[in-house]
Regions:
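C-terminal ends of transmembrane alpha-helices
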Residues: 32-37, 101-108, 162-176, 215-229, ...
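Membrane-cytosol interface segments of multi-pass membrane proteins
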Residues: 1-163, 210, 257-265, 269-272, ...
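Residue-level hotspots within the lipid-embedded alpha helices of multi-pass solute transporters
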Residues: 56-59, 127-131, 176-183, 188, ...
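Hydrophobic, small-residue-rich membrane helices and short re-entrant helix-turn-helix hairpins
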Residues: 78-84, 196-204
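Hydrophobic/aromatic residues in alpha-helical transmembrane segments
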Residues: 66-69, 186-189, 244, 248
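Alpha-helical membrane-inserting segments
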Residues: 96, 100, 104, 137, ...
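Loop-centered beta-sheet repeat module
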Residues: 153-197
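Alpha-helical transmembrane segments and terminal signal-anchor/GPI-anchor hydrophobic tails
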Residues: 173, 181-183, 198-274, 278-308
Length: 318
């Protein structure tokens, strides 16, 4: 076996690990916008305009995480210990943060204790809850995939994406949306790309990226400035957001495989970073203390934003 094959077999593809890192950075950026108070700040403020347009990458990144899972797990057996490890990691960070907070705060809060003891059941972090539910379902999803031919698989995806993405993006059938169901659909798309090696998608990827990026930017500005429900749904299942995430994912899997131990080391901490910074106790503390609104009109705003992101990325290594 040559060195390149050994790297592919024994080490994770650093293209995908780099994509994971970029995704968690995008999610932190999204949370900095979503959980901060920007009342009375308008799009005339350039920093705010850029943050408003870029933060949507957080929602897109959630889809990319699931696409990656579908791409790599479709041909694997999900072992019970992997599911248990995922659940225990979620519980560990929840317990640890609760204990530290209670000690520092000097008093016991019953609601915090209850929510911390059962983070998955109380949906303290919707992404982690949905991801764990998806992971539990993967063995059964993979059985379905194995028993479908390409035509059946394609038809199933067409129906699912139409019902749960295209129509809701136009303000139709929103009441039937479920993030868990959407994660299953996105997983199926990632698995489809892996199973059938969609070369035609690779060839059209640049066009998809440009079209979806421009379309999404126009939609966001129109929605904000004129308060028009042109695209009523700006959730993870928004069709244009899904296409943009898909094109980013395809770009990274289409690159030449390489290995970098530093990228892979940082990437291995992504789940922990997500669990810590978006913990229901930590979340309000971070975005209240950083007070981004006070810096939004400063020329060094983005340096401040980058500093916050770097600090959050380093939390797991403290």
């Amino acid at each position: 076996m040559n060195l390149n094959k050994k790297i592919q077999k024994n080490n994770r593809n650093s293209n995908i690990e780099l994509l994971r890192i970029l995704c968690i950075i995008s999610i932190i950026l999204h949370h900095s916008y979503y959980h901060s108070d920007f009342s009375n700040v308008t799009l005339e403020n350039f920093n705010y305009l850029m943050l408003y347009l870029i933060e949507i990458l957080g929602n897109i990144s959630n889809n990319i995480f699931v696409l990656i899972t579908g791409y790599y797990v479709v041909n694997s057996k999900v072992k019970l210990r992997n599911i248990i490890k995922l659940v225990l990691e979620s519980i560990f960070y929840s317990y640890a943060i609760m204990i530290i907070y209670t000690i520092i705060n000097g008093k016991v809060d019953a609601n915090i204790i209850i929510n911390s003891l059962t983070p998955i059941m109380h949906n303290s972090n919707w992404f982690i809850t949905c991801y764990i539910l998806l992971y539990i379902s993967i063995p059964f999803i993979n059985i379905l995939i194995q028993n479908l031919n390409k035509k059946q698989y394609s038809y199933m995806l067409f129906i699912a994406i139409t019902i749960f993405s295209i129509l809701p993006s136009l303000g139709l059938l929103n009441q039937y949306f479920s993030r868990y169901i959407w994660f299953i659909i996105v997983y199926l798309v990632g698995a489809y790309i892996k199973k059938y090696d969609c070369k035609e998608l690779y060839l059209k990827n640049d066009l998809l990226f440009v079209f979806s990026s421009i379309s999404l930017a126009i939609i966001l500005i129109v929605k904000k400035v004129w308060n028009v429900g042109l695209i009523i749904n700006i959730d993870n299942n928004n069709f244009i957001m899904f296409i943009l995430g898909l094109s980013i994912f395809v770009e990274f899997i289409n690159r030449k495989i390489f290995y970098n131990k530093y990228i892979n080391y940082i990437s291995s901490s992504v789940l922990g970073i997500y669990l810590i910074h978006d913990n229901f106790i930590i979340r309000p503390i971070i975005w209240r203390k950083t007070n981004l609104k006070a810096y939004i009109d400063k020329p060094y705003f983005w340096l401040y934003e980058i500093l916050i992101i770097l600090i959050i990325l380093s939390l797991i290594h403290i």
